[in-house]
Amino acid sequence: MTTPDAFRDAEYIADVSGISYGNVANLTEQDANVVPRENERMRKLQLAAKVAFIDRLLRDLDILIYCELSALYYMDCSVILFAIRAIVQLIFFTPKAPPFDPTRNQPFIGAIFVSNIFCMIFHNFFTHPEASEATRGYLHGGLLIDFIGQKAPIPLFRLFLLDFLVLILDLVMLGLIVERVKTTGQTSTTSTEILRVQDHDSEERGVHRTRPESRSSVVGAELDETDGHITRANAGVGEQAEHTQLLADPSEDGHTPGAKNSHPLDAFSSGEAVIMNLGLFDVIRDQWKYSTTAPPARTSSYIPSDQTAAFLRARFGLQVGPDGRVQRIQS
């Protein structure tokens, strides 16, 4: 993930986002209503950068798995085993262009374990790569091309080790796909804070109602005195936090904090961002539970136009039902 291509993807996302260095940290108190929108933009930018890094890692792992399959083919010279794994890799794990984005509605667990366990059993009990003197001790095989493999005999432990490595890489790619689906499916969390409009009463009390406040704020006769204490307490806490920030993270000029010159993608560029916390057993359990759960009934919102409905009815005697399925008109 330290290749220039991954950072080029993230830099492109940063360029099109329109977020410059320090434009959020330099906002004043009068621009407090702009901060939530800027925070939402930064959050979307970071999610887009995370998806870009996951896509790059998926492509790199896909190439690595094909290289491992090629190495295994040169050791066992079995087109059947190579084709089984290559087809599974192509269908389930090879990244594809939109709209064929990866989803979790596929039998990943069955495809991974069935294909890899079958190849392991075949290598341990049925395949014994040997070569005769006619081939000078080298393995030959292939249906279309007579590839020359390695020199026989091939240790079974090496075959089993490569089989296990392919299995681990498949599970890692499954974890990345699950994380990508979760990242792209995230929605903006609804804040419990509301934005209130400034009125005359708040203006007389010296309270800024445009600042976000909690829904559980107490409304009563003692509001004036309580708001006064809260305002003074918040002012003291704000001054203390600002003082601590100035002492802890001074900038070069000594007037503004260094955080104002930051960018949402600094963590990705510096390598400090965590793409995902991978636990193989957790990934297997979550995907298995997701696969065994019955999907909810889908209601199609597709409504054909009058011209399309008339054409289907006149030409083929078909109609689109309420569930979106094409049905034959019963005469």
Curated annotation (Swiss-Prot):
<feature type="compositionally biased region" description="Basic and acidic residues">
    <location>
        <begin position="197"/>
        <end position="214"/>
    </location>
</feature>
<feature type="transmembrane region" description="Helical">
    <location>
        <begin position="63"/>
        <end position="83"/>
    </location>
</feature>
<keyword id="KW-0325">Glycoprotein</keyword>
<feature type="glycosylation site" description="N-linked (GlcNAc...) asparagine">
    <location>
        <position position="26"/>
    </location>
</feature>
<feature type="transmembrane region" description="Helical">
    <location>
        <begin position="159"/>
        <end position="179"/>
    </location>
</feature>
<comment type="function">
    <text>Component of the DSC E3 ubiquitin ligase complex which is required for the srbA transcriptional activator proteolytic cleavage to release the soluble transcription factor from the membrane in low oxygen or sterol conditions. Required for growth during hypoxia and triazole drug susceptibility, as well as for virulence in a murine model of invasive pulmonary aspergillosis (IPA).</text>
</comment>
<dbReference type="InterPro" id="IPR013715">
    <property type="entry name" value="DUF1746"/>
</dbReference>
<keyword id="KW-0256">Endoplasmic reticulum</keyword>
<dbReference type="GO" id="GO:0005789">
    <property type="term" value="C:endoplasmic reticulum membrane"/>
</dbReference>
<dbReference type="InterPro" id="IPR038967">
    <property type="entry name" value="Dsc4-like"/>
</dbReference>
<protein>
    <recommendedName>
        <fullName>DSC E3 ubiquitin ligase complex subunit D</fullName>
    </recommendedName>
</protein>
<keyword id="KW-0472">Membrane</keyword>
<keyword id="KW-0833">Ubl conjugation pathway</keyword>
<feature type="transmembrane region" description="Helical">
    <location>
        <begin position="107"/>
        <end position="127"/>
    </location>
</feature>
<keyword id="KW-0812">Transmembrane</keyword>
<comment type="subunit">
    <text>Component of the DSC E3 ubiquitin ligase complex composed of dscA, dscB, dscC and dscD.</text>
</comment>
<comment type="pathway">
    <text>Protein modification; protein ubiquitination.</text>
</comment>
<dbReference type="GO" id="GO:0032933">
    <property type="term" value="P:SREBP signaling pathway"/>
</dbReference>
<dbReference type="GO" id="GO:0044695">
    <property type="term" value="C:Dsc E3 ubiquitin ligase complex"/>
</dbReference>
<dbReference type="Pfam" id="PF08508">
    <property type="entry name" value="DUF1746"/>
</dbReference>
<feature type="region of interest" description="Disordered">
    <location>
        <begin position="197"/>
        <end position="225"/>
    </location>
</feature>
<keyword id="KW-1133">Transmembrane helix</keyword>
